[in-house]
Amino acid sequence: MSSSLQELCRKKLPDCILPEFFDDYVLQLLGLHWQDHGSLQRIEKNQILVQQEPIHINEALKVAASEGNYEIVELLLSWEADPRYAVVGALESKYYDLVHKYYGQVKDCHDILPLIQNPETFEKCHELNSTCSLKCLFKHAVMNDMLPILEKYTDYLDRWEYCSQMLFELACRKKKYEMVVWIEGVLCVGKVTSLFTIAISNRDLQLYSLGYSIILEKMYSCRQDPTFLLNHFLRDVSIKGLLPFVLKTIEYGGSKEIAITLAKKYQHKHILKYFETWES
């Protein structure tokens, strides 16, 4: 079969119901047979049938690339599959010729990283951009919940306090709470209280509460009095009128009297009303 006729069939036939008498040989001639998988048919923009079983086109592309099946990869890309999945699949199976061929259609490795679950593949993908640094890798590891990357470089990071502090604050801003706990507990973070500033700025009550859980446990274990710390941030959230944060601070031992005094001073009626109702 001529290549032009085969190309026409690959484009037009998949949108139709394939005749039952099309055996594997005919489908191979048409370019619509995937070795070890079966017939291929496009049914929607993002869905195909593989041997009559529905599968997302991008998942199929990832599998085809992981098998090094150039023809099927090309076919699925012609059906508008996302080339990022070709890069991921090829990286996982170390088909680097395919990686470099299709990476050019993506251009930025950081657009691929969110699709990757395996830390080794994640790091290999990041290396596709030769201008990126380890600090960049660590930042994207935080943003994509790739803790094994940080664990691999723990000794390196532990000697780099500036980077550890930056990653800690990034995890706070991105609401990566497990990362926050791990970084604070394992690496050298010089200013843990920056967590509260970020939590208040972003109105992130969960992070705010997490901060107290982390810091107070350490202070109590060292027999330190947390009153100054609690009332320092209580003043901040009271002045801003952030009732949920006020209540959370009082829950951990902050002074209710300070909150009421500042609510009166800054005329935060909703805070005053809450305490009046609470006391009555």
Curated annotation (Swiss-Prot):
Q: What induces it?
A: Expressed in the early phase of the viral replicative cycle.
Q: Which UniProt keywords apply?
A: Early protein
Q: Does the keyword Transmembrane apply?
A: no
Q: Does the keyword Transport apply?
A: no
Q: Name one Pfam family in it.
A: DUF249
Record-stated family: Belongs to the asfivirus MGF 505 family.
What is this protein's function per UniProt? Answer: Plays a role in virus cell tropism, and may be required for efficient virus replication in macrophages.
Q: What is this protein called?
A: Protein MGF 505-3R
Which organism does this sequence originate in?
African swine fever virus (isolate Tick/South Africa/Pretoriuskop Pr4/1996)
